[in-house]
Structures are given as structure tokens and as C-alpha cells.
Amino acid sequence: MKNKQKTPSLDTIRTEIDTIDTQILKLLNKRAQCAIDIAGIKRTKNLKFHSPERERAVLDRLASINKGPFPNDAMKVIFREIMSASLALEQPLKVAFLGPEGTFTNLAAVRHFGSFAQYIPVESIKAVFDAVEYGECHYGLVPIENSNEGVVSYTLDMFMDCELKIAAEVLLEVSHNLLSKSGEKSRIKRIYSHPQGLAQCRGWLEANMPGVPLLDAISTSKAAEIAAADDEAAAIASELAARLYDLKVIKRRIQDKKNNYTRFLVIAKESPKKTGSDKTSIMFSINDKPGALYEVLYPFKQTGINLTKIESRPSKRRAWEYIFFVDMQGHTDDEKISSAIEKVKKNCLYLTVLGSYPVDARLYKR
């Protein structure tokens, strides 16, 4: 008879996991020391301490060689935290975001920069731009558009009056959750959220919480704060808000439309280098005459450049003068992109490149 291979015992497998964990810890510290050494070289050569294009290259390389079973999405989250912690050993990134803490903007910032950046909530989109422009923060994060509500016009307006660049984009699925102190649906007598949050969950609330008063809060995070102080109140907010205010999740993903996401922009004083999967945003103004917009956009068609978004806004300088915002696939370091932009400039009153930055093809779900 052939000997059957003996299945390892639970204790044996756990011992092996402990050994692997010890090896991982040693390698993490070895990697951290490498990061410290790199920081020293950067200081000596007066190089910028944060290289987002390098971080993107690290994640892309690992994703390309990952054979599983560990999923790439989880791997990227872990390595994002490793890079965030390593960078903090040198100097924590300072990131301004439209506050308060616990909002979806805060969640998007953490997803992009990791848990070890220093996050600074501010009260307005303008304050985010100011914090970066005056050197108080390395980066800022602002909402630019929602799949249901459309473009955030004020963010576009801010680019008209500053020289900051777009350094990245972050796509975040807006997942609304019903939260309370007890986690018991039967105890809820009132529900708080931002008006937009209440509107996006109205169908679920009518079907599952009929007759329960719906009360406005200035933000989803403020709603969570109120619920944390009221045993009979619930909040509609993010899971990050639940963690911040020690609330339990009664029901996840209660929004009526499941395909609801917000695109955020990371702003900085300069854009990153080319990664190979990039997007470029420009802003321009044209003469008010028939066919003017067609003439401006024609060089993009001629060179086969894919325009992914076009928005227009009143310039607020002269009546009936409009500013156009255009996103396209590619980087200004690409000859095709730079050449087309130079041709476009000839038919514009002015044109500004807002930045070239990595495409975020992921849709974070939280």
C-alpha cells in the first residue's frame, strides 16, 4: 500500500505562519532602513523627498508579478501603508482636505496617501488650495465630480486664479452606511446626515425606516458625531466615521444607486513624472465666434488623442466669456500630446496645462 501524505496539523501550520510573520517583520525593517538611506541621499542632492511616480511604479511592478492567491487590490493597500509608514520615518506628508474628519474626502485622502500622512481638515475648497499654495501642506485633496451630482464647479473655478498643478486623481465609491452607538435598528428614533446623503438613501430609508425623522447635518461626519452622543440617533456616514466615533454599523451600502462614485483631485506645486498610464488636464479660453471650439479641438482629433472630458465655466471676467476644461489620455512628456497642445494654443486666447498625472483605474469600495 502507498503511504498517504499526512495532512499538517493546525499547530504545525500556525507555527509556519509565525515563522513567515517573523521573516516579514525583518524584511519590513530592512526595507525601512533602505528608505532612510534613500532619504539621506535625497537630502544630500537636494531632491524632493516624495516621488509619487516611483510609488506608482512599485505598485504596478508588484501587481504584474503577483501570482496569487493573495489579491492585487489587497496587496496594493498593504504596500501603500508600508510606503506611507516608511516616508513618515523621514518626514510625514502634510495633506489638506475638505473637512471635517471622517468625511468621504478624508477617506479618499487616506486611501491615496496611507494612514501615516498628517491630515489637516480645512473648512473650504479655497482653504485647501491656500494651504498648498502658501506651503503649509505638501498636497491638497478636493472633490471634482460625482457620478450622480455632476461636476464640482467651485473646484474648477479655483484653477482660474492659481498656479497649482494636478498631481493625481482618486476615485472613491461613495458607500453610505447606517451607524449608531448600539448597532440596533429597533432603537433608532431619528437619523442624521448631510442632505445629499439623505437624498441618496431616500428609497432605502422609506422602505426600511418608515416614519423615522430625517434630520440635516452639515456633513456626514458631523452626523456621526451627533449619533455618538445620542443613544436613539443614527447617522448615515462612511465606515471611517464609524471608526472615528466608535459607532456600530447597522447596515452597509444603503444608497439607492450602487454605482455612485466621486472623483477627487490631488493638488500640488508640480505634477509627477510620466508613469506610462497618465492623464493630462488643460484649461483654455477662446474667441466667441462660430466654429472656434471645433478649430481648437481639431488638432487632438488629427493626432488621435482621446479626450475623456470637456467642461465649460463662465470666466467671471467678461460677459459670455467661457473657460474650457479638457482631460485627455497621455502625458505632456509624450511628443504627441505636447505637439497637439502647441497647435491648440494658436487658436486660444490663453491655455494652461493644469497637470499630467497617473490615471486611477481602481474604484475603491468602502
PLM feature spans:
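Domain-level signature for soluble enzymes in the chorismate/prephenate branch of the shikimate pathway
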Residues: 1-366
